[in-house]
């Protein structure tokens, strides 16, 4: 008889585990996102009566929500604060939608987040200083929104960042020196803001940088000689700024150059070791590239 009852208990435990699903807290957070972004009008809607693992764009591993990919899905409205309850999230891709409102500070509580893609939305307000708490982040892309204020110094704390794209917003102020600590960075996009001042010499620490786009801002002064250390650079766009000297660019290692766009300033830049057969150089006021 004891064996019989033991088998019943074991069977019950196995059944509970098999049908446990995601936690109530995570499911509630997902429903909050659905409701706050007008889920009934999404292109691909969620059937809230079905298991979470079956919801479009949601990846569940071991009963934990680890990815949300709702790219180009007609999300409208703001991001809810309880999105922080998705504590196992590693990827959040809500790009190419019509999300409004501000970036909730609670986003910074997603300590496992590796990818945050919110580009091509209508998000306004400042980038919260708490963004620097996302220490696992490898990609932060918020280009083409209505973000204002300055670039937070705390971004320099996100040491694993490889892609940082803040282009086409209303950001102002200077590039914080702290960005020089992002030594794993491969892409930095600050195009089309109202950023000003000189490029900090600390940028020369970004030895893995392949793409640096600073065009269409109000940067001034001379290009710092420290940029000569960026031997991996392939794309460098600095046109439509107010630089008064490009002399230090002649120190730039250019063996990997594919694209270089600048304002001519009545002066030809003599690069060393440049391969003119593979490099596009344009002394133009503006030339966009399709990647």
Describe each PLM feature range:
Residues 135-225:
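Eukaryotic tandem repeat interaction scaffolds
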């Amino acid at each position: 008889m004891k064996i019989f009852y033991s088998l019943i208990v074991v069977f019950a435990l196995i059944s509970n585990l098999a049908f446990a699903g995601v936690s109530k807290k995570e499911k509630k957070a997902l429903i909050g996102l659905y409701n706050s972004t007008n889920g009934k009008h999404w292109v691909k809607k969620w059937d809230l009566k079905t298991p979470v693992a079956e919801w479009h764009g949601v990846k569940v591993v071991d009963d934990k929500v680890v990815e949300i990919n709702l790219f180009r899905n007609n999300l409208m409205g703001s991001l809810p604060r309880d999105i922080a309850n998705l504590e196992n999230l590693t990827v959040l891709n809500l790009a190419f939608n019509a999300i409004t409102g501000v970036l909730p500070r609670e986003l910074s509580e997603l300590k496992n987040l590796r990818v945050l893609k919110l580009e091509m939305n209508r998000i306004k307000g400042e980038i919260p200083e708490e963004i620097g708490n996302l220490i696992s982040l490898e990609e932060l892309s918020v280009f083409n929104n209505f973000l204002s204020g300055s670039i937070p110094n705390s971004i320099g704390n996100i040491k694993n960042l490889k892609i940082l794209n803040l282009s086409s917003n209303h950001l102002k102020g200077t590039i914080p020196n702290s960005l020089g600590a992002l030594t794993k960075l491969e892409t930095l996009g600050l195009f089309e803001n109202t950023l000003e001042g000189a490029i900090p010499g600390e940028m020369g620490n970004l030895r893995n940088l392949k793409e640096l786009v600073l065009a269409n801002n109000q940067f001034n002064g001379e290009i710092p000689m420290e940029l000569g250390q960026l031997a991996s650079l392939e794309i460098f766009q600095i046109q439509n700024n107010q630089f008064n000297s490009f002399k230090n660019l002649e120190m730039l290692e250019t063996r990997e150059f594919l694209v270089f766009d600048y304002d001519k300033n009545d002066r030809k830049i003599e690069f060393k070791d440049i391969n003119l057969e593979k490099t596009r150089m344009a002394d133009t006021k503006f030339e966009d590239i399709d990647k």
